[in-house]
Amino acid sequence: MHELSIATQLLELVAEAAARHNLRRVNRLRLVIGALGNVVPEALEFAFYAAGEGTVAAGARLEIVQVPIAVRCNACGAESTLEDFAFLCGACGALDVEVLRGNELYLDSVEGEENNGTGAADG
C-alpha cells in the first residue's frame, strides 16, 4: 500500500508549508493526483488521517482532486480522455499516443490558522 508512504510525505510537505507561512494549525489541503498513479483515494485518506494525528494537520480536511488520463494521438492529432488504461486514440483508434495528463501528484494548496489569525499557503 503506497498510500501510507504518500500520506507520510504529504504530511512532511504540509509541516514545511505550515512552518514557512507561520501556520499553527492546518484546516484544509488540496492534493492533485493523476489516474496513472494508481492511488486509492479512500486508502490515502485513511492513511493521512491516521498518520496525521498529533501533527499540525491533525483534523485537517483533505481534498483529493483526481485527474483523468488524457492523451494526444500522434497519428491524427486528436486529444482524448481515457476511461481505462487502454492507450488508444479515441478518434482513430491508433496506438501511437502521448500522455498529456494523468501523471500528476502534488500538493496544490494548504489553508490554516496563522499564529495570529487565519491564512493560506500555496503548496
Regions found by a protein language model. Give the residues of each.
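Short, flexible, mixed-charge glycine/proline-rich loop motifs
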Residues: 61-69, 78-83
